[in-house]
């Protein structure tokens, strides 16, 4: 299993890029090969996912570990294959996608190729509440218009702002904040995961 490759980007096509490392050219399928255009002719680090079938072994490439993580999560959804998962994250911005999943916005999800209403609902069913690992590092937090975070620890405040950005209401958050406040010394990620578990009970 490969984790990443470092080498020169020698070729860019509409479907894949070629990275040369150790005098071997690796064909790597990416969601948006042209996002690597600025790196053509220079060294790049590409995070990899190796997909094995009876008749084919393919390498899928990503510019961040967050993209790869989301890709693997999408593959776990019934009806989503590698090409569909890649098309979903091809924009390179995972925040709107995660927000749509957490807020159950199936209309947004059906905008992606090969994602119909049924598949969109399946994505929400399988992944809602399971993407907290990506949330904290990817979402840009905005100061809230209410005092919901007043008096909270910096870690819990960051978690609450992340959940607000994902579409959870003040009413929903006020129900779980007292329970979260009882847990000391948790990271933002840990608070987010705990809050999602409490709100889905």
UniProtKB/Swiss-Prot annotation:
* Any one GO biological process: DNA repair
UniProt xrefs under Pfam families: HHH_5, RuvA_C, RuvA_N
Say if the entry is tagged with keyword Transmembrane.
Answer: no
Q: What is its main location?
A: cytoplasm
Q: Where is this region: Domain II?
A: 64-142
- The segments labelled Flexible linker in the record are 143-153
**InterPro entries in the record, alphabetically?**
DNA_helicase_Holl-junc_RuvA_I (IPR013849), Hlx-hairpin-Hlx_DNA-bd_motif (IPR003583), NA-bd_OB-fold (IPR012340), RuvA (IPR000085), RuvA_2-like (IPR010994), RuvA_C (IPR011114), RuvA_C_sf (IPR036267)
| Region feature (Domain I) | 1-63
Tell me where it resides: Cytoplasm
Q: Provide GO CC annotations from the record.
A: cytoplasm; Holliday junction helicase complex; Holliday junction resolvase complex
Q: Which keywords annotate this record?
A: Cytoplasm, DNA damage, DNA recombination, DNA repair, DNA-binding
Which terms does the record give in the GO molecular function aspect? ATP binding; four-way junction DNA binding; four-way junction helicase activity
- Which segments carry the region annotation Domain III? 153-201
Classification via HAMAP family = DNA_HJ_migration_RuvA
Subunit structure of this chain's protein: Homotetramer. Forms an RuvA(8)-RuvB(12)-Holliday junction (HJ) complex. HJ DNA is sandwiched between 2 RuvA tetramers; dsDNA enters through RuvA and exits via RuvB. An RuvB hexamer assembles on each DNA strand where it exits the tetramer. Each RuvB hexamer is contacted by two RuvA subunits (via domain III) on 2 adjacent RuvB subunits; this complex drives branch migration. In the full resolvosome a probable DNA-RuvA(4)-RuvB(12)-RuvC(2) complex forms which resolves the HJ.
What does the UniProt entry state concerning the protein's domains?
Has three domains with a flexible linker between the domains II and III and assumes an 'L' shape. Domain III is highly mobile and contacts RuvB.
What is the recorded function of this protein according to its Swiss-Prot or TrEMBL entry? The RuvA-RuvB-RuvC complex processes Holliday junction (HJ) DNA during genetic recombination and DNA repair, while the RuvA-RuvB complex plays an important role in the rescue of blocked DNA replication forks via replication fork reversal (RFR). RuvA specifically binds to HJ cruciform DNA, conferring on it an open structure. The RuvB hexamer acts as an ATP-dependent pump, pulling dsDNA into and through the RuvAB complex. HJ branch migration allows RuvC to scan DNA until it finds its consensus sequence, where it cleaves and resolves the cruciform DNA.
Which protein family is it in?
Belongs to the RuvA family.
Protein's UniProt name: Holliday junction branch migration complex subunit RuvA
Q: Which gene encodes it?
A: ruvA
